[in-house]
């Protein structure tokens, strides 16, 4: 039996009509005058032939053949994409030039350099080159070469794991510029600073020269866990620790200069991120740190044995000293996290537009890791108030609870004794009213007597009566008639020094961790 289709007779009805498709028993067919062979293999997007048990069921809707989605937007500066402006090719050539001659041969399809991009080209080229050089050593080249190749593959696996983890966590996309910002926050510090005296090492809180990171006018940025001891005019003196990494000559020195540096740094980071070249800017920044030279302004010595937290003797001071020496980095993170609320107010009031722009941009793109890094970076140099780092947290808590202090209050009652009336208590005066919190005074104004307060406050001077500016903190003479304890400008008497033999109780020796040396 012939399989050729039956020829049709040409009539007026079917002369101009489109030729019909013809199917053959073998699976072939003629479509538009072209013979098509049977398609072998499964067809994408179309359900296969149903089983006999399924033919009684209604046929479901066929799925369309999937089509490859065209990439939308930019394809560069994304995780896994090469850098623009020939950055990927340039780093590839840099790795080729840095690699030894033995690393030029390829390792085949499992070569780690096939999957590397950007800075990964340099890392993988060096590890593979080292493995090839180990393989050329006589006698032991085979085992050393195999171990070195396994090490190179392990490094590549770590790079792939880091790229996958940091590229798929929401809000935590990692970049080299993020590591550059983190390098400004803290430098890994040892738990103790030591000084060498005639071959004998003593544990001290004084910063060594290697712990000094940056020096400005009246300020020193250093690693956490120490306090600078500066020699000036043939005398050594401990500087005041404003933050765990920032010390000043005195507590009144403004930190505007350091905060402007942070403004410029965060503004540059935001601009680089907006231009999608953050990794390139971060690489330039990290490399520039290797060649940065800052002249020394001050002579730092280690003969002061400063306390990390200056102030009166308290349990909070001893606990803070112990924490700073136990883990300087942990103390730094805790201190900066607690300073974030005050830092937010300072960055708005101080018009730090670079930091505000960075926070706004990173928040809009959902990069919360960089938002936290910028907040910690600004909190690390935010020393606008005169409270030292150890007392800031305690003072903030005391200031919050003082708003709800009820103050001394009493109920006035009349008592009839033997026909005469007596008042059991005297009324509250203005001196006791000073101890009432602000919010409590608003809600309980009817419970205390404010008589005499205007007369008391008349002796206090407004702020325009004082000299403006900043400088060393001096003690006001409390014997002046204008000084009153309830005035805002009242200064207490300076602390004196008494011999330990006159102290009744334990005597503390403030080494890096306070130690009780005896009891008098």
Swiss-Prot record:
Listed result of changing residue 53 to A: 13% loss of phosphorylation by PKA and 19% loss of phosphorylation by PKC in vitro
UniProt signal peptide: none
Disulfide bonds: 453-460, 487-495, 504-509
Site label Cleavage, positions: 177-178, 191-192, 383-384
Positions occupied by motif Nuclear localization signal: 5-13, 38-43, 58-64, 66-71
Region of interest: HVR2: 474-479
Biological process (GO), any one: clathrin-dependent endocytosis of virus by host cell
Positions of the UniProt region annotated as Important for lipid droplets localization: 164-167
Residue ranges of the region described as Interaction with APOA2: 122-173
Protein name per its UniProtKB record: Genome polyprotein
Protein family according to the UniProt entry: Belongs to the hepacivirus polyprotein family.
Residues spanning the membrane: 169-189, 359-379
Keywords: Acetylation, Apoptosis, Capsid protein, Clathrin-mediated endocytosis of virus by host, Disulfide bond, Fusion of virus membrane with host endosomal membrane, Fusion of virus membrane with host membrane, Glycoprotein, Host cytoplasm, Host endoplasmic reticulum, Host lipid droplet, Host membrane, Host mitochondrion, Host nucleus, Host-virus interaction, Inhibition of host innate immune response by virus, Interferon antiviral system evasion, Isopeptide bond, Magnesium, Membrane, Oncogene, Phosphoprotein, Ribonucleoprotein, RNA-binding, Transmembrane, Transmembrane helix, Ubl conjugation, Viral attachment to host cell, Viral envelope protein, Viral immunoevasion, Viral nucleoprotein, Viral penetration into host cytoplasm, Virion, Virus endocytosis by host, Virus entry into host cell
Pfam families linked to this entry: HCV_capsid (PF01543), HCV_core (PF01542), HCV_env (PF01539), HCV_NS1 (PF01560)
Residues in compartment: Cytoplasmic: 2-168
Mutation effect (residue 99 to A): 40% loss of phosphorylation by PKC in vitro. Complete loss of HBV suppression
Annotated segments matching region HVR1: 385-411
């Amino acid at each position: 039996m012939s399989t050729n289709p039956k020829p049709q007779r040409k009539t007026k009805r079917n002369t101009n009509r489109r030729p019909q498709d013809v199917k053959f028993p073998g699976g072939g067919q003629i479509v538009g005058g072209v013979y098509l062979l049977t398609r072998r293999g499964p067809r994408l997007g179309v359900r296969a032939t149903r089983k006999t048990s399924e033919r009684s069921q209604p046929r479901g809707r066929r799925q369309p053949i999937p089509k490859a989605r065209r990439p939308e937007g930019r394809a560069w500066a994304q995780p896994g994409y090469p850098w623009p402006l020939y950055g990927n090719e340039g780093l590839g050539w840099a790795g080729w030039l840095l690699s030894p001659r033995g690393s030029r041969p390829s390792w085949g399809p499992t070569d780690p350099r096939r999957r590397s991009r950007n800075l990964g080209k340099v890392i993988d080229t060096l590890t593979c080159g080292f493995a090839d050089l180990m393989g050329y050593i006589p006698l032991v080249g085979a085992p050393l070469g195999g171990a070195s190749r396994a090490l190179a593959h392990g490094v590549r696996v770590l790079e792939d794991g880091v790229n996958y983890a940091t590229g798929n966590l929401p809000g935590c996309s990692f970049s080299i510029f993020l590591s550059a910002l983190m390098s400004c926050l803290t430098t890994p510090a040892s738990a103790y600073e030591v000084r060498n005296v005639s071959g004998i090492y003593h544990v001290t809180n004084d910063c060594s020269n290697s712990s000094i990171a940056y020096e400005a006018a009246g300020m020193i940025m250093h690693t956490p866990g120490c306090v600078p001891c500066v020699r000036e005019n043939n005398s050594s003196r401990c500087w005041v620790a404003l933050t765990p990494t920032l010390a000043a000559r005195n507590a009144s020195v403004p930190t505007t200069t350091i905060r402007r540096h942070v403004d410029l740094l965060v503004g540059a980071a935001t601009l680089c991120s907006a231009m999608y070249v953050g990794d390139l800017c971060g690489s330039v920044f990290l490399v520039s740190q290797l060649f940065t030279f800052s002249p020394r302004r001050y002579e730092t010595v280690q003969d002061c044995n400063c306390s990390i937290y200056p102030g009166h003797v308290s349990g909070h001071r001893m606990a803070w000293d112990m924490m700073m020496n136990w883990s300087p980095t942990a103390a730094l993170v805790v201190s900066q996290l607690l300073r974030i609320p005050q830092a937010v107010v300072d960055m708005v009031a101080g018009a730090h537009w670079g930091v505000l722009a960075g926070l706004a941009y990173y928040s809009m793109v959902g990069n919360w890791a960089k938002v936290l890094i910028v907040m910690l970076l600004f909190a690390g140099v935010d020393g606008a108030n005169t409270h030292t780092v150890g007392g800031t947290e305690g003072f903030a808590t005391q200031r919050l609870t003082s708003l709800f202090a009820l103050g001394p209050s009493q109920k006035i009652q009349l008592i009839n004794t033997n026909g005469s009336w007596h008042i059991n208590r005297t009324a509250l005066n203005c001196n006791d009213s000073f101890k009432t919190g602000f919010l409590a005074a608003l809600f309980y104004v009817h419970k205390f007597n404010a008589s005499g307060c205007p007369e008391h406050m008349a002796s206090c001077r407004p702020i325009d009566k004082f000299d403006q500016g900043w400088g060393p903190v001096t003690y006001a003479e409390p014997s002046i008639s204008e000084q009153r304890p309830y005035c805002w400008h009242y200064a207490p008497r300076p602390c004196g020094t008494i011999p330990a033999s006159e102290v009744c109780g334990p005597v503390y020796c403030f080494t890096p961790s306070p130690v009780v040396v005896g009891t008098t």
